[in-house]
UniProtKB/Swiss-Prot annotation:
InterPro entries: Iml2/TPR_39 (IPR019412), TPR-like_helical_dom_sf (IPR011990), TPR_rpt (IPR019734)
Similarity annotation: Belongs to the TTC39 family.
Function per UniProt: Regulates high density lipoprotein (HDL) cholesterol metabolism by promoting the ubiquitination and degradation of the oxysterols receptors LXR (NR1H2 and NR1H3).
Top-level taxonomic group: Eukaryota
Organism of origin: Mus musculus (Mouse)
Tissue expression: High expression in lung and spleen. Low lower expression in liver and small intestine. Weak expression in heart, brain, kidney, adipose, and adrenal gland.
Protein name, as recorded: Tetratricopeptide repeat protein 39B
Any one GO biological process: negative regulation of cholesterol storage
TPR repeats: 328-361, 520-553, 561-594
Keyword entries, A-Z: Lipid metabolism, Repeat, TPR repeat, Ubl conjugation pathway
Outcome of gene disruption: Chow-fed deficient mice display increased HDL-cholesterol level, accompanied by increased ABCA1 and MYLIP expression, increased oxysterols receptors LXR (NR1H3 and NR1H2) protein level without change in NR1H2/3 mRNA levels. Many NR1H2/3 targets are up-regulated, including ABCG5/8, SCD1, ELOVL5, INSIG2 and LPCAT3. Deficiency of TTC39B reduced processing of SREBP1 a pivotal regulator of lipogenesis.
UniProt keyword Transmembrane, yes or no: no
UniProt-listed Pfam families: Iml2-TPR_39 (PF10300), TPR_6 (PF13174)
Length: 617
């Protein structure tokens, strides 16, 4: 049972992990006050009335905000945010952020989002502080229980429906705040204590959502009348839907471990809950829509198969485009959808518009720079791709190692005279990568580790730098860019020409320690181009060459399992579904300890989910 209503759970300056340590040493009588169940308590709050305008709240005012006003102003702040009025949204919520649970949730969410986007340590600290305040505010509204009531709850689940409406909303807000604080805990520092603290927050949030879902079912069964039931329902749908969806994406071996400690994830159920939430009229309905959009336009591509439900994405986005035609976030999703359809020119135009419509949050610009860089890579407009990679290196702190590697990789695709015109030193850039890697939750980012390993070729023990073969196209493959390029025959044909030129150049070079690895990389990329051009027999020959060279590879051992993944898709496209599944399972079960292993396992999990049973995803 989730910790619901315990003041011990959140004191002024303590978090879940510290509370857990305190709980270990408490006596049984003290434990009874922890309230591990929803229990019947008679205390009901007096109505909080909005005594003054939130924007003009006098210092020290004792005026209170009722649930209705909190929901309305939080919804208004969301509209301001989607209209690029980020500061206005914060200023609307700030005066009541320590009095109203929804003002606290909305205000801290915007501060946290800013922290995640900037990756500045000061912003991260501000986000943690804001979220700690928000948790304290939500705690004020949660169920309070006496020792007797808590003891009785150990014998029975109690009457869930006897929570007041305000207390139910407090649980949802508290769970949302916990999740966001966990995310910041992971990026704050790399020590194990923070990792454990973040994990405990996520588990507590998950348990609260499960309990809120039980409350929702009780209310629906008993047909209880509540003024803001649809808002509570929207919060439950958003939380449980997102949890189910995200957990279902994890590789099978991780899911088995999480199920052992009480987690479970069902993709179809998660999408259903989010769709139900999106179709409602609650404040969180837009957030349910945006979560599904993120799944279709990003997650399905990077951690999935690349098979995207563009039709649903367009349908969900349409009302937002009408209401917020110049909203940065909405334009960004619009551009992503156009890109996934293969409309690279339209996507470019929309990303540029996304940049031009606001200057308040430069972080949205960085997202667009990233996308524009990839579009130019797809088109092999290397100087333009270099321009955006350089902007990212200078302005964004998200992943310096990745940005610098990509900048060097793009430059290495250019003729030497054009590189000289940029006054950049490609070898020097590659050598910088190792010193720029970072750690989150105590772990290096997989894409940064990959970039560091590839860049080592330029810093060999002998002191004589080697040279990577088509590193920009290799990174494009890693980010599943061939799925996007596959929508355009002209782009696929142009890429095939480039790959075949590299193949010919390799054949004319002296044999080195890297020759087999480079040859297999070229064969993998060539096979992907041929697969996109619907030339399956030639593609299969390329893929088989990589698999047959497995024992000869010295460095890039990731090539074989990733090639098996591509081979499985080739078989599936030819109707050989059983053969495809068998190859996927071989890739999953027979290989380990290679670069980007987790990313491939995510993709295999997504493919098996789609292929083993009918799906409406």
């Amino acid at each position: 049972m989730a910790l619901v209503g315990s003041r011990v759970e959140l004191d002024a300056d303590e978090d879940i992990f510290e509370d857990a340590l305190e709980t270990i040493s408490r006596s049984p009588s003290d434990m009874a006050t922890s309230g591990f169940h929803f229990v019947p308590c008679e205390t009901k709050r007096t109505s909080r009335q909005l005594g003054a305008s939130a924007m003009g709240r006098p210092e020290g005012s004792s005026a209170k905000v009722d649930l209705k006003s909190g929901l309305e102003e939080c919804a208004e702040a969301l509209n301001l945010f989607l209209s690029n009025k980020f500061k206005d949204a914060l200023e609307l919520l700030r005066p009541w952020a320590k009095e109203s649970m929804y003002h606290a949730l909305g205000y801290s969410t915007i501060v946290v989002l800013q922290a995640v986007m900037t990756f500045e340590q000061q912003d991260i600290q501000n986000g943690i502080s804001a979220m700690k305040d928000a948790l304290q505010t939500c705690q004020k509204y949660r169920k309070k229980c006496t020792v007797v009531e808590s003891f009785s709850s150990l014998l029975s689940r109690g009457s869930l429906e006897q929570l007041s409406e305000e207390e139910m909303h407090a649980e949802i807000c508290y769970a949302e705040c916990l999740l966001q604080k966990a995310a910041l805990t992971f990026v704050q520092d790399e020590n194990m204590i923070n990792f454990i603290k973040g994990g405990l927050k996520i588990r507590t949030s998950y348990q609260i959502y499960k309990e809120c879902l039980s409350i929702l079912h009780v209310i629906q069964k008993n047909k209880q009348e509540q003024h803001f039931f649809y808002e509570f329902e929207g919060g439950v749908k958003l939380g449980t839907g997102a949890f189910n969806l995200m957990l279902s994406l994890l590789p099978a071996r991780i899911i088995r471990l999480l199920e052992f400690i009480g987690f479970s994830g069902n993709r179809d159920l998660g999408l259903l809950q989010l769709r139900e939430g999106a179709s409602g009229s609650s404040m969180r309905s837009p957030l349910c829509c945006l979560t599904i959009l993120a799944f279709h336009t990003y997650i399905s591509l990077i951690l999935g198969t690349g098979e995207v439900n563009v039709v649903e994405a367009e349908s969900l986005l349409a009302p937002f485009l009408q209401q917020f035609p110049n909203g940065s976030l909405i334009l960004f999703y619009h551009a992503r959808i156009e890109l996934l359809k293969g409309n690279t020119e339209k996507a470019q135009e929309t990303f540029r518009k996304c940049i031009s419509v606001q200057e308040e949050w430069k972080q949205f610009h960085h997202l667009c720079y990233w996308e524009l860089m990839w579009i130019h890579i797809y088109q092999q407009n290397w100087m333009q791709a270099y321009y955006y990679s350089d902007l990212l290196c200078k302005e964004s702190k998200w992943s310096k190692a990745t940005y610098v590697f990509l900048k060097a990789a793009i430059l290495s695709m250019l003729p030497e005279e054009e590189v000289a015109a940029t006054k950049e030193n490609v070898v020097s850039l590659f050598r910088q990568v190792d010193g720029l890697k970072q750690r989150i939750a105590g772990k290096s980012l997989p894409t940064e580790k990959f970039a560091v390993r590839k860049a080592r070729r330029y810093s060999p023990p002998s002191g004589v730098p080697g040279k990577l073969v088509m590193p920009a196209l290799e990174m494009m493959y890693v980010w599943n860019g061939f799925s996007i390029v596959g929508k355009r025959k002209d782009l696929s044909e142009n890429l095939l020409v480039t790959v075949e030129k590299a193949e010919e150049a390799l054949q004319n070079q002296d044999f080195t320690d890297y020759s087999v690895d480079d040859e297999c990389l070229v064969k993998l990329l060539k096979g992907c181009c041929l697969k996109n051009l619907e030339r399956p027999l030639q593609a299969e020959l390329c893929f088989n060459h990589v698999v047959e060279s497995e024992k000869l590879l010295k460095y890039d051992h990731y090539l074989v399992p990733f090639t098996l993944f591509e081979l499985a898709f080739l078989y599936k496209s030819q109707g050989e579904i059983d053969k495809a599944i068998k190859v996927l399972e071989t890739a999953r079960n027979n290989y380990k300890d290679y670069s980007l292993e987790s990313r491939l396992h995510f993709r295999i999990q997504a493919a098996l989910h789609l292929w083993k049973k009918p799906s409406t995803d």
